[in-house]
Amino acid sequence: MTYKRVLLKLSGEALMGDKPYGIDPAIVQSIAEDVERVIANKVQLAIVVGGGNIFRGLKGSADGMDRATADYVGMLATVMNAISLQDGLERVGVETRVQTAIEMQEIAEPYIRRRAMRHLEKGRVVVFGGGCGNPFFTTDTTAALRAAEINAEVVMKATKVDGVYDRDPNKFKEAKKYSSLTYQQVLSDEIAVMDSTAIALCKDNNIPIMVFDIFKKGNISRAVAGESIGSLIS
């Protein structure tokens, strides 16, 4: 089953590649080429991008910053990533619009739901930056919110691991990978795949979540085509 309208969540860390900080142009190009294949198959694609490769609000708060202030700095980091992603996508011929929850008229459109949906209908990729515009909400929650708003069929969380595990596979060799699990299981067992607000929002709106490895070339188009390449939460 090929999905028709997809919300792709890219973590900021995914854009780092093997770098300790910032954006790896090779990773952006690889993502852009994969997205180009998705768009060529007439799939409508919106992207929410994180900012953890540049600044993470929770860490800033832990280091002594006011939490709301730290979150706003994190939102600005997501806009930097969104513009970089737009550049990469347009280099491979994918028409792209950036919409931000905090107005920055010189560099991006403001987030307007109906306009975003119209862009999708015209075959453009829409990259959402600036989180949801409010502190105390993660970009995972933004992904769930935007998916509900644009009537996406699925949230695809592209990350550093190849699915959902019962514990950190980088720390525990015996970690068990789930091929599928329920929203309630994630919430009850406090499985660290997305924050509870994001999971609950997807649960309330019956939007499945697919978690897969972004670093394996071609995985975005495989996920959109419905291949079982990661873990499915529903």
UniProtKB/Swiss-Prot annotation:
Quaternary structure note: Homohexamer.
Example of a GO MF term: ATP binding
Role according to the record: Catalyzes the reversible phosphorylation of UMP to UDP.
Keyword Cell wall biogenesis/degradation listed: no
Key words of the record: ATP-binding, Cytoplasm, Kinase, Nucleotide-binding, Pyrimidine biosynthesis, Transferase
This enzyme's EC code(s): 2.7.4.22
Enzyme class of the recorded protein, top EC level: transferase
Name listed for the protein in its UniProt record: Uridylate kinase
Gene (name only): pyrH
Binding, UMP: 51, 71, 132-139
Pathway the protein acts in: Pyrimidine metabolism; CTP biosynthesis via de novo pathway; UDP from UMP (UMPK route): step 1/1
Binding site for ATP: 9-12, 52, 56, 159, 165, 168
One GO CC annotation: cytoplasm
Family, as annotated: Belongs to the UMP kinase family.
Alphabetical list of InterPro entries matching this protein: AceGlu_kinase-like_sf (IPR036393), Asp/Glu/Uridylate_kinase (IPR001048), Uridylate_kinase (IPR011817), Uridylate_kinase_bac (IPR015963)
Subcellular location: Cytoplasm
Description of how activity is regulated: Inhibited by UTP.
Alphabetical list of Gene3D superfamilies matching this protein: Acetylglutamate kinase-like
Catalysis: reaction(s): UMP + ATP = UDP + ADP
A Gene Ontology BP annotation from the UniProt entry: 'de novo' CTP biosynthetic process
Domain of life: Bacteria
